[in-house]
Regions:
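Flexible, compositionally biased loop and terminal segments
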Residues: 1-219
């Protein structure tokens, strides 16, 4: 089967999962749609996917659910028509304060970090800051995702057990959930399984289990 059919099914399911996440009270949903490396795929597949992006997103989805739309990545690599579509959607949904739904398009986490390093280097070179001023917060402020919190949970579908150059900096303390189900078939039941798995974990952020339990008792 042509992979473009899979992309179409995946985008259709994205609408379903976005609606479900809204109902569950999720505040931030970020989806890896297209990596910079994906430009190396056959030209017909890339062109078809760009066409799907142009035709898929229905504004009603965002209007009905109070969802703001965002895009992160090296957007200037995308066709101008796709850039215009994505920026228009950001502008049209900017007033919504429910869930923030972000699409990673033309995204590479390594490139994102390199880009942040270049911005910071220029500031040092121009005398706007010194090397000693650089810390984790400095880097985070110059990432494409600087406006959103780090993810609590990363879900990887399709039986893959890698994160494929996605949010490498941001996922330092994220919980990972891997499943064999492919994204087009990722259902409400699968989403609930992922969330329940996350809820049953103890996030320690470098502390001991005893420390976390003591902190919980104080609440």
């Amino acid at each position: 089967m042509d992979r473009t059919f899979g992309h179409k099914a995946g985008l259709d399911n994205l609408e379903t999962i976005t609606t479900l996440c809204c109902k569950l009270g999720v505040k931030y949903l970020t989806v890896y749609a297209f990596s910079i490396e994906n430009f190396n795929r056959p030209a017909y597949e890339v062109e078809a996917l760009m066409g799907l992006v142009l035709s898929f997103f229905k504004m009603q989805l965002f209007h009905n659910n109070n969802v703001s739309f965002h895009v992160v990545g090296d957007v200037e690599r995308l066709p101008q028509s796709v850039q215009d579509k994505l920026r228009s959607m950001e502008e049209e949904t900017a007033m919504y304060d429910g869930m923030a739904m972000t699409i990673a398009m033309s995204y590479s986490s390594k490139q994102e970090i390199v880009n942040a390093a270049k911005i910071i280097s220029r500031k040092v070179q121009n005398g706007e800051m010194s090397i000693d001023d650089i810390d984790e917060d400095t880097i985070e402020k110059n990432l494409w995702t600087n406006w959103m919190p780090d993810p609590d949970l990363l879900i990887r579908t399709g039986g893959e057990v890698r994160i494929s150059n996605y949010l490498l900096w941001q996922c330092a303390y994220s919980e990972f959930y891997f499943c064999d189900t492919y994204w087009p078939d990722f259902s409400e039941e699968e989403l609930h399984k992922a969330i329940i798995s996350f809820q049953n974990r103890q996030r320690r952020f470098g502390k001991t289990e005893a420390q976390i339990e003591a902190e919980e008792k104080k609440k």
